[in-house]
Amino acid sequence: MDAHEDYVWPRATSELILLPVTGLECVGERLLAGEGPDVLVYTLDFGGHLRMMKRVQNLLGHYLIHGFRVRPEPNGDLDSEVMVAAFGSKGLRIVKISWGQGRFRELWRSGLWNMSDWIWDARWLEGNIALALGHNSVVLYDPVVGCSLQDVPCTDRCTLSSACLIGDTWKELTVVAGAVSNQLLVWYPAAALTDDKPVVPDRRVSGHVGVIFSMSYLESKGLLATASEDRSVRIWKVGDLRVPGGRVQNIGHCFGHSARVWQVKLLENYLISAGEDCVCLVWSHEGEILQAFRGHQGRGIRALAAHERQAWVITGGDDSGIRLWHLVGRGHPGSGVFALSFKSHSRPGVLKAVTLAGSWRVLAVTDAGALYLYDLEVKCWEQLLEDKRFQSYCLLEAAPGPEGFGLCALANGEGRVKVVPINTPTAAVDLTLFPGKVHSLSWALRGYEELLLLASGPGGVVACLEISAAPSGKAIFVKERCRYLLPPSKQRWHTCSAFLPPGDFLVCGDRRGSVLLYPSRPDLLKDLGVVSKVGAITSAPGAGSGEGEPSLAEWGPMSTLPSLHGKQGVTSVTCHGGYVYTTGRDGSYYQLFVRGGQLQPVLRQKPCRGMNWVAGVRMVADGNMVILGFHANEFVVWSPRSHEKLHIINCGGGHRSWAFSDTEAAMAFAYLKDGDVMLYRALGGCTRPHVILRESLHGREITCVKRVGSITLGPESGVPSFLQPDHLEPGEPVEPGSEGPGLIDIVITCSEDTTVCVLALPTATGSAHALTAVCNHISSVRAVAVWGVGTPGGPQDPQPGLTAHVVSAGGRAEMHCFTIMVTPDPSPPSRLACHVMHLSSHRLDEYWDRQRHRHRMIKVDPETRYMSLAVCELDRPGLGPLVAAACSDGAVRLFLLQDSGRRLQLLAETSHHKRCVLKVHAFTHEAPNRRRRLFLCSAATDGSLAFWDLTTMLDQDSPALEAAADLGLPFQLGSPCLTVQAHSCGVNSLHTLPTREGHLVASGSEDGSLHVFVLAVEMPELEEAVGGAELLPQLQVLEEYSVPCAHAAHVTGLKILSRSLMVSASIDQRLTFWRLGHGEPTFMNSTVYHVADVADMDCWPVSPEFGHRCALGGQGLEVYNWYD
């Protein structure tokens, strides 16, 4: 551990933070957002949208910003210059800003004033500022000099949970304090006869049964709103609070939140509340819920602001997201459910089915065989035709397209299908396709060129009809093109179909949950070279499309994914962007693609919680995707991007006839209820006119951070070049992304919210872009491991981008393996696109159920958690990498990845530690003229480290590989090569670095200590081997040092950067650098970061001009950089 050169002390600077948004304030046409100690400034552009203007870093030091107060100007002009007080915790700072003409300049900044108590509210009073402190006192402060002018306490020196200051002068200043006794205390600081003499409360207001977290006063109407822990919002009639002795009356008690209410704001016509349930509710002053905004994830909405003139509501959440919502009248017009009044004496029969032809025409059929049309422009019902052959049992489907192409199809229980032109129903065409019941109908449309109708009959036969129109447009031609045969099942009919571009294939879903691939034209099979894979069976006589017509061959599927969506069936198939999206009643939707005429699953995703019936997928105008489905008795349109329920219709559930249509002009949903047709229609289509000012990261704590690699983008990717500093005027703002492409680091984070997120972190802009999220886990994700990092196309044909294999693991002993491919894409703001392919998954309890010898095994506790992962890449050809997992049940398990990650199986295990294993770390040892040795280090809650030699276990004749081939009991690793008692309690961080002497090993513990030692690997001489047997290497500790009080809390991150430098991170929120090489590690310097409860850290070198980067994950994400 000798240092050969003096090391320059690194100075870490914060480059990026993604923390809960705790403060929001609208100032004229600008928005101020507080994120940690930083301020984000947004400005309103000419298009009426907010855009990012500036980030002011570290304004409040080590305090979190909880609020802003703007000093009112005599002329009311806040568009050019403004004086802002930012406060939070015990800190206060005043800053004067110039932001006119789109340029941001900081003119003056006061010192950071530290108060003696928590600041709950602040208010400007004639150049000074009044502060309401945490134990029911008020301080009048001079922000320029930085001194207290007056300090007046209340006689009730209780702890406050909130406070509100009212008034413009010291004489009329009123304090409304929310005490821990659940009361509101109203008192007047100016009533104090002398300074520091307590003031008796003027009024005490009771009503809530929990502490009060927020309050808002509307002076024009004399109303006060309070939000409480009891999940309610109360409205009080208080009159002018600046006048003592007034009467307080509770005029509203609003229940609508399912958890604690954090924030409340009173407007002239609305009351806005937001809480721990991640819902923002808009109320009338009478207590009626007018709107509900859902989209944030995690533990709630922490900040709330409103812009009355623009009719905006802005929310900031624990998920680091900022969202802008439109109030009623500006946001979501034309929505609502209304009955179409079908019941009439002139329309006999009972409605059996309903469908939509576009978004403004409704079709319905009765049990009398009558087909009716309702035009939303004419607003009346019209009978198109009546056919007694379609009474009792009748199917109805309208052709897809903006206005349904003016076609619909009927089918009955006798094998008859009728294709009806809606505008000329007398030109309907009848066909008898089957000798029995038609089970289902579906349409398949290829642009405006080809339209097919598929009908399922008895025996799994699907007739494919080609529909074309006459040149006059008044007649249609229907021709049976071919027949398909479904795989055998109990309920043997198809449920949906779609063309796969460019149109050579049809993708179908069936009732047993399978996804099938058929040729759209059987005569194309010869050109595709897949004739031998598809069987053709001649149909039985009499099963043709008409009397005397020749029988058609029934073509089997080219590719099948059996029971992909379980036993409830596939509900929709959609093709977009080269992928196939399927949905089902198993509560999931799949992304598939076709390669070589075969269907291959890419990714399985789940929509919002509780949507067990996923009905469809739609691509909207902005390029995003929305999911349709049923959540209990409600039909829901859900956005995966914003995690928001865009539309909610209480229809009674999906076990009824319903139809959905979406165009850019409007969205429509029709369903049958109480013998009538109900229609929900919303102008503007599926989308909602709200703005995501900043994307969410994770809804819960980040548990692991792992850097994958880096990508360099240039002008060919549509990214502008670097701007030289002399091209910018002093103080000119730099747009995010305009600093140039530079280097972009790809980082993977996982969280307690069960998601794995892929982030792009540009080195030049100090921003973060969420590329994609993987939501396959059913419980929290605790660890991520990466291997096989490369470029698209492989070494032979490298292309711009990055590819990698990823393994994620966490709660419920669940592990998933997938690949990511990040490629340049000029469309999104990140200039990158990320494609994910799920390869395999593994759960210990499911693995146990499949074993033949499970009676000889102890069933694994289903609550077992994987705490840490390590990938051991092998040099043996034909054998995939090993994944080592630290398990909470005291075991260390080794999994073998085969077939490029598509097979994941348990290979070996050991229960040496007999207690929860917290960390695993793999490293290799290479000696001259010797084989490469693979070692694994594991650490447990007793502070011990165990070292295992995995090389011998992976030999050609190893019993571990024989057990893997036999899929029997996992191989037992036995005893470790070396055990080191490094700490007195759990080891939360572990890292190694190869040196000339062996390996430098460092660990950090829950007691805040560090342990560093040199591990020597002694290889036996070749002459010592007798009879060709290989002698095992000997491990021993050469030097060993400990730092007992390196941190004040758990050390959760540790990285040996070089032989002379180490960096550690702890829950005490300090990033500390240590000098190695001179005995005990020596403290160099420390930087305070703002992420609370840090769970993991990753560091990597970037380049000589950018130095090192370090990502810290906990309750948020923060990225630091330093230069060597």
Swiss-Prot record:
GO biological process, one term: wobble position ribose methylation
Protein name in UniProt: tRNA (34-2'-O)-methyltransferase regulator WDR6
InterPro entries in alphabetical order: tRNA_Anticodon_Mtase-Reg (IPR051973), WD40/YVTN_repeat-like_dom_sf (IPR015943), WD40_repeat_dom_sf (IPR036322), WD40_rpt (IPR001680)
Subunit structure, as described in the record: Interacts with FTSJ1; the interaction is direct, and required for 2'-O-methylation of position 34 in substrate tRNAs. Interacts with IRS4. Interacts with STK11/LKB1.
Gene3D superfamilies: YVTN repeat-like/Quinoprotein amine dehydrogenase
Protein localization: Cytoplasm
One GO location term (cellular component): cytoplasm
Acetylation as UniProt keyword: yes
A single GO molecular function term of this UniProt record: tRNA binding
Gene symbol of the encoding locus: WDR6
Presence of keyword Amino-acid biosynthesis: no
Pfam families: WD40
WD repeats: 53-97, 105-143, 147-189, 200-238, 247-285, 289-327, 335-376, 381-422, 425-470, 476-520, 557-596, 602-640, 643-682, 743-789, 852-897, 905-950, 974-1015, 1039-1076, 1082-1124
Protein family according to the UniProt entry: Belongs to the WD repeat WDR6 family.
Superkingdom in the source lineage: Eukaryota
Primary role: Together with methyltransferase FTSJ1, methylates the 2'-O-ribose of nucleotides at position 34 of the tRNA anticodon loop of substrate tRNAs. Required for the correct positioning of the substrate tRNA for methylation. Required to suppress amino acid starvation-induced autophagy. Enhances the STK11/LKB1-induced cell growth suppression activity.
Key words, A-Z: Acetylation, Cell cycle, Cytoplasm, Repeat, tRNA processing, WD repeat
Record PTM N-acetylmethionine, positions in chain: M1
